[in-house]
Design a protein with these regions (language model features):
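Short amphipathic alpha-helix that is part of the acyltransferase structural core
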Residues: 1-30, 131-167
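Conserved donor-binding loop and adjoining core beta-sheet/short helix segment
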Residues: 3-9, 18-24, 31-94, 196-209
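Active-site rim helix/loop that mediates acceptor-substrate recognition in acyltransferases
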Residues: 26-46, 164-191, 195, 200
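Acyl-donor-binding surface of acyltransferase catalytic domains
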Residues: 54-138, 273
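Conserved acetyl-CoA-binding loop-helix of GNAT-fold acetyltransferases
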Residues: 77-87, 212, 216-218, 222-238, ...
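Conserved beta-strand-loop-alpha-helix junction that forms the acyl-donor binding cleft
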Residues: 96-102, 246-256, 273-276
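Conserved acetyl-CoA-binding loop of GNAT-fold acetyltransferases
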Residues: 111-117, 260-269
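Recognition helices and adjacent regulatory flanks at domain boundaries
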Residues: 189-191, 202-204, 223-236, 247-249, ...
Length: 276
C-alpha cells in the first residue's frame, strides 16, 4: 500500500470523502477538522494529512494538527492502519479515533517506536436525527456573546479539569474565542435568572455538526438544565442539518442516559490514547 502525504486540505477531503462518508458519524471528528483546515486555515497553525492508497481506492486516512493527537479513520482494507504507522515519520503525542482503529494504530505505533500506549479517555459516540423534547425545566436558551467570554473560559476550563482529568492541549480562551467567532461554530447558554449551563458546537460535516462540550457547574446540577439545553440546541441545529453528534464519557452513565432520553443513539466507542 502507498501512503501519501498531502498538504492541501481541500484535496484531502475530496480524496478521502468516499471512505469517510461511509460512516459519517464515526468520522465526524476528521471531517470537521479537515473542513476547518479548508475553510478557516488560520485556526490551526500547522497540519499533517495522509492517505493510504491500495492502487484502486483510498483505503485509509489520518490527520494531525500539532500538538494534538493523530486522528485515524476506519480503513476499508486490511493493512492500511499498519501502513500508516510504518510510514509516518513525525513524532506523535497520541491518537484519537473510534475503536478498534485507534487501538490498532496505537499497537502498531508501539511496536515501531517502543512507546507505551495509555488510554486517557474512553468515550461513546452518539448520533441524533430527531429530538425527544424535554419539558418542565425552567429557563431559556440564548446565544452567547463576547460579554460572556470570561464566564465561558472559566466554565470551559472547569469542564476540562473535571471531565478530561487533565489539562487540555487547546487553552480554554482559544477554544472559546474560536467558537464565538467561527462561521460554523458557536456557544449557547441556558439562563434561569442567571447563566446556569452552556454548550458549544462546531466541526461541521456534510450532513451534521458536533455538540460539545456541555457543562453545568456543580451548584446548578440535578435540575435538568443540561438536558433541556442539549435538546433545544439539537433542535435548532437540525433545522439546517440532518444529524447531530456528541461524545460522552463512558465512565459517566448519568450523562449517557440523559442523551439517550433526548434521542441520541450510540454509534460506537472512541478512545484518546497517548504514547508514553
Amino acid at each position: 500500500m502507498d501512503v501519501r502525504r498531502l498538504y492541501d486540505p481541500a484535496a484531502f477531503l475530496e480524496a478521502a470523502s468516499p471512505l469517510l462518508l461511509e460512516d459519517e458519524a464515526r468520522h465526524n471528528l476528521m471531517l470537521g477538522i479537515a473542513a476547518t483546515l479548508r475553510d478557516e486555515p488560520s485556526h490551526y497553525p500547522a497540519h499533517r494529512l495522509w492517505l493510504v492508497d491500495d492502487g484502486l481506492e483510498v483505503a485509509g486516512a489520518a490527520l494531525q494538527t500539532p500538538p494534538h493527537n493523530l486522528v485515524v479513520a476506519r480503513p476499508c482494507k486490511d493493512g492500511a492502519i499498519e501502513a500508516l504507522a510504518t510510514e509516518i515519520e513525525d513524532d506523535l503525542p497520541g491518537v484519537n479515533g473510534a475503536v478498534p482503529e485507534a487501538v490498532r494504530f496505537a499497537e502498531a505505533w508501539a511496536a515501531k517506536t517502543g512507546k507505551k500506549p495509555r488510554t486517557t479517555f474512553a468515550q461513546g459516540l452518539f448520533q441524533l436525527d430527531r429530538v425527544e423534547s424535554v419539558s418542565g425545566v425552567s429557563g431559556t436558551l440564548r446565544e452567547a456573546g463576547v460579554e460572556d467570554r470570561e464566564l465561558l473560559i472559566e466554565w470551559w476550563q472547569a469542564f476540562v479539569e473535571e471531565a478530561l482529568h487533565e489539562s487540555a492541549v487547546e487553552p480554554a480562551d482559544h477554544a472559546v474565542d474560536h467558537r464565538l467567532s467561527a462561521r460554523e461554530a458557536g456557544v449557547v447558554i441556558w439562563d434561569d435568572e442567571t447563566p446556569v449551563s452552556f454548550a458549544a458546537f462546531g466541526g461541521p460535516t456534510p450532513n451534521g455538526i458536533r455538540i460539545g462540550p456541555v457543562y453545568t457547574p456543580p451548584e446548578h446540577r440535578r435540575r435538568g438544565y443540561a438536558s433541556a439545553l442539549t435538546a433545544r440546541l439539537s433542535s435548532r441545529l437540525l433545522e439546517t442539518r440532518r444529524l447531530c453528534f456528541l461524545y460522552t464519557d463512558l465512565a459517566n452513565p448519568t450523562s449517557n442516559k440523559i442523551y439517550e432520553q433526548i434521542g441520541y443513539r450510540r454509534v460506537c466507542d472512541a478512545a484518546a490514547i497517548v504514547f508514553d
